[in-house]
Amino acid sequence: NAVAARAITARSPIAGSPVVGGAIRSDLRGPREGREMDLDFGAPLWLPGQRGALLGTVDTGVAEVDRRSDLRRLEVAGALRSAWWEARDAQRAAQVARERVNTAQGIARDVARRANLGDIPPTEALLARNETLAAELAFAQAEALAAATVATYRTITGGLSPDTLSPEAVRAGEAHPALLAARASVERAQAQARLVAATPRDNPELGVFARREVDQLAGDSTSLGVRFRVPLATEARNAPRRAEAEAEITRTTAELAQAERLVNADTARAEAALRVAEANARLARQRLDVAREQEGIALAAFRNGETGTFDLFRVRQLRLEAAVEEGRAAVEALRARSRVNQARGVVP
């Protein structure tokens, strides 16, 4: 709004505020019957091309503010993406912890049954009970962390639940907001340079005046006139303004080049990380499938009395590690897609 308000000046028929002035003079000697009164009215005039150049600075300034707002929106989207994935990661960890509790309780029942029958020592039943308690403790901690991350996400989003959204797919972005903002800054600096070039001197002023003279001897008289004032252009005035405008163009152009390099580097890095994350997720799924099959065989062997409790828990621990890694790898692969979209400037 502050930038757009300058358009009011550019649309005005005069280049600034009008001026009203006056003066009264009287004789100091004699009967003081001679008096003179002046009334002036003047206004600054636009220089050739100055008005259009000022409108150009307004348009480019508004465009820069809009582009900066888009960039800020992308930054907020990045924070929301990060908070959402933190919540989903914690929820996935709580789900794995719950599965650990369920399997631990199932094994504990089998171990207790065999211990009651005398097939295995009672110490192995205590081992199963200890594992169940450890699983329940880990689940309580994971559930508390998930609740905390969900609460953080709700605070950021104003009460929205992370369950209302689904993982986003990789999308091809249009022009990146950071590049658009940098280009808008260059255009604003160029428009300012054009305004400096169109204003080589202060604005001329055109005015009218009226004079009323009262004199008992010579008689009263009234006169009207036109006054015109044209400031002269000097290097002492213009050189610093040109240098400042050129320096601003140089600065914004350098920032644009830097933004292009950073955006390209961030996009390439995010795409490479996505390929690695997807490969890791495939390997983690394969490992989990093997671990589940191995656990099923070990559990069947335990129930048939072919293996002991320690061997079963060792195989089960491998499956739990594989499940944790698979969950983490799956979330990381989906998060890598969001990072690619963020690097490409895609707003969800």
Residue ranges and their predicted role:
Residues E271-E306:
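C-terminal hydrophobic structural anchor segments
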Residues E325-P348:
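Acidic, low-complexity, intrinsically disordered peripheral segments
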Residues N1-E86, Q91-V101, Q105-A108, P122, ...:
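Short flexible linkers and secondary-structure junctions
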